[in-house]
Amino acid sequence: IGQAQALRERLAALPLTAVVTSPLDRTVQTTRLMLGDRDVPVHLDERVGECRYGDWTGRPLKELAKDPLWRVVQAHPSSVVFPGADGESMPQMQHRAVSAIREWNDRLGPDAIYAVVSHGDIIKSVLADALGMHLDQFQRLHVDPCSVSVVQYTSMRPFVERTNDVGGDLSRLAPSPKKKSRRRTSDAVVGGGAGA
C-alpha cells in the first residue's frame, strides 16, 4: 500500500490521460491507491493481465523452482508453454501485451501520457520488445513492485526512457509547452541528446 501511495505522489505532476490495468484484484487495488482522488479514466484490459501460468498458478515459488520447466523459463522462455488447459506460451504472453499497448497508444494518440498497471513478466516482455531484445533475454530485466518503466512509441520505433525507476523525479516526463520547430526526418536525435 505504501509503495502505491508513494507512486501517487511521483505521478502527480503528470497529466495522465488514462490508466490501463490488468483486471486482477491486486492491480486494480494498486491503480486505485495510485490515483487517489484523481479523475482519470481506468480501463481494465485482460491483455495486460498476468501470464497464464496454467497448472503453475497459485503454486509456491519454492515448489516451482524444483520443476524442470523452471530452468527453461529462466534460460529459454521463448520455448516455454505452461502446462494445463489454460496455460499459454511466453511468446503468446508477450505478443498480447505488446499488441495491447500499441493499440492503446494508437487509440489515445501520440501526445497522451497514460499508465499501464501490470505484472513483472508482462512489463519485462514489453520492455524487451521495445529494446529489440529476444524474449530469451528478458530475464535480464528487473521490475520492482510499483516501479516506473517508460516507453515512448513513435511512428518509427519505441524509445525506452526509464526502467524500474523506484524513486526518481518524474516531472521531466510531463509535456513542455509546444515550440515552433523544424520538421525532423527522424525521431532520434544525432548524438543522443534532446536536440535543438
Where are these regions (language model features)?
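Active-site-proximal alpha-helix that buttresses catalytic centers in soluble enzyme cores
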Residues: 1-39, 44, 67
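Phosphate-handling substructures
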Residues: 36-99, 152, 162-163, 174-178, ...
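Generic structural signal for well-ordered alpha-helical scaffold segments
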Residues: 5-12, 94, 98-106, 127
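Short beta-strand scaffold positions
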Residues: 21-22, 95, 117-118
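Active-site signature of alpha/beta-hydrolase-fold catalytic machinery across serine-
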Residues: 33, 125, 129
